[in-house]
Amino acid sequence: MKGILKMKKYLYTLLSLLFVATISSCEKGDLLNIITQDIDLNENSKEYQQYLKERIESYLKTYRFEEAKKLVPKLTEEETQKRFWVLYNKYHQEALTQGCGYILASGDTLFLKVMNIDEIAPSQLKALTSFYDYVELKGTNQETTLWGLGNYPALETLSFPSCFVSKVKDLDKLKQLRVFSLTADKEKYEWWFTSKAFKPIDMAGYDLSKNDKLDSLLFDGVDISNLKVTSNTMRLLSLKHGIYTNASLNNIHARHIDIENSDAADDELIINNKAIQRLSIETNADNNKPFKLINVANSSLHKLYVVETSMEQRTLKKVILNENIDTLTIGGYISRGDVPQQSVELVGLSRLNRLKRLSYNPDFSPIATKDLPKNIEGLYIGGSGNVPYNDGDSFDYSHLSKLKIYSNGKFISANMKLSTAIDSIYLFPSQVFGDLKALDFSGLKFTKADIYIGSLTRNDVELPMLKRFVFPATLKQLKLSNAQSEVVDLSRCTHLKSLYVDDSRTGERAIKKLILPKNLKKSDFKRQHKSEFENDYAFKLSDINNETVIENLPSWVENDGNGTYSVPND
């Protein structure tokens, strides 16, 4: 009976070993630790000796020489020991030319085997993304240097998905390197280095100055303040949860730079990097150190995206623009709406004659319509927070002769004058300025509209329903939800191809009259692609009140008796 129990324990351990041998992810450290524990067997038994042989061979194949070295002396047969020492030397020599390793502060090397399932020759391998993990590094709490990348001179992609190495050797030998990705995750760091607080990895130990073919740098959890890179222009620098400086943004010649939730080491960012075409910086001021000023006047960038969010206090004070900008997003919000905030000053906006697309949050920067450059083609107003405009403010967009898309998710005004150039309009307002009684778009020429009115307030008081909502003759596509209007007039819209009207409001807030165009043709609403419509036709009236009068309702429209009007499939 005792022998049977021993055999079961041996088989269980052997199965565990065979399973773990297939595990390649560094996240399996705890599983690997299971098989490093001693088992309750007689070391001189045939079963245990067989187990040792398999265990040693597994260690050697994954270049864990220090573990194999501990076990070889436990082999009872001298010839077997000699055979494994020969095998040890074979794999050790292989590791020198086909592996990598951690160089510890003591000078010792812990070898790492590169994950290479297709067994491509090291000199030809183009992508290195993972290793067979050395789990005992978890308990060392040591800073290390990574060695061995020179064995892979053809690498085009180098990715460290969970890396806390402070220095990497032989990067200069990767002449074909195009993409370098490194992630240092805080939670994983604290799991590995149990006695140290996490801080972004200092990239001073990474020298990329000789990698002239670099195309993309993708970093998460690192400090790029001291990073050395090639002087050649690359495509992308992406940094998340890290640290950057004004100098690093100027010294790294990337056409696109994306910074997200990272600390700005400098209060002022003065960008003169001529390589940058697009700069995006998104900051959560509650978790990251924000900057107070950004000046791109002397740069050549065309696209600028600046967003700062926080709970109570805005840090950014001023944005100085350059005349080459064609796409601008300025936004962010303060969660505490009751805390007065200073608006962000935009310098040079009215001079941006090349600006095609502008997206802004009025709570961040309440731009006056008179300051909008005349060549804008897309205007997007939205975001959380207050709308610091007044009833007397002008919202005259008529001078924007090239405006094609107008999107406003914040407000509408009795003083609003839209450009006749608009082709598509998107309205999702919650606030009203001025004495708004009706919305009459009959003088405009847009072909597409997506509008949700909901509950409108003026000075925190809900407004009564609009008297009339009138749409232009040019309209082809309409999605209208909760119109908050007594009359919805579509009588001019004889070119309609897609119509969706939803009115979930009831009682006095429901639409009183819906006027459709006369002589609508069923064939005009035949849809070709999937959409919100459930059948073959792009025509649907939903949640329509039983008291609502529908004028000119076509005979080919079917009413289900519950407020839905649609077209049956052919």
Predicted segments, located by residue:
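Acidic, glycine-rich calcium-binding repeat modules characteristic of RTX/beta-roll
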Residues: 486-487, 505-512, 517
